């Protein structure tokens, strides 16, 4: 379907980002195809959306997401490795965790983020959710998915959103698993995470 968004305040995402008005955004098959003066717009082939002076901008991209968490700082230190083992140990807790992951992805979409890149997650949740969003059975942003990252023993996030590989054959096994899960990228978590307080 073709859409024409008119009567809005356009933020174009450029460095200067000055509000533009009096323009109509044309979208064909989900792709922005043109930005034309609103007054002269021939819109008979478009479904017209009147923005009534509201703001519109291109979708944002979040390039570093762990859907296993909501992004809020932890109030206290916890044993993430133990927590993940507990979550992944039964069908019930995996189902609950997956619903939470899907909810966190939906939160991203509702905040204006239309694409996310996941860089470490629980099992195959990220590719599973990506596929459900693409098929239209779940609501969320487009996902470039890594599923679990690959780390080393004692490495960053090893045992939680990354799998520790002790040897080259271990690492190759994890790469093969990622290939079977049809990930979009491989996340390596070899060094310790850098946190500034």
Regions found by a protein language model. Name each.
Residues 1-43, 56-57:
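N-terminal metal-binding scaffold of metallo-dependent hydrolase/deaminase domains
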Residues 4, 46-50, 145:
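Conserved beta-strand scaffold positions in the cores of enzyme catalytic domains, especially
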Residues 8, 25, 30, 53, ...:
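Divalent metal-coordination and catalytic microenvironments
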Residues 11, 119, 189:
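Conserved residues at the C-terminal ends of beta-strands
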Residues 35-36, 70-71, 126, 153, ...:
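Glycine/Thr-rich phosphate-binding loops of Rossmann-like dinucleotide-binding domains
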Residues 44-55, 126-137, 170-182:
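Short amphipathic alpha-helices and their capping/turn segments at secondary-structure boundaries
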Residues 55-132:
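Metal-associated gating/positioning segment near the N- to mid-region
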Residues 137-197:
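Metal-coordinating catalytic core of metallo-dependent amide/deamination hydrolases
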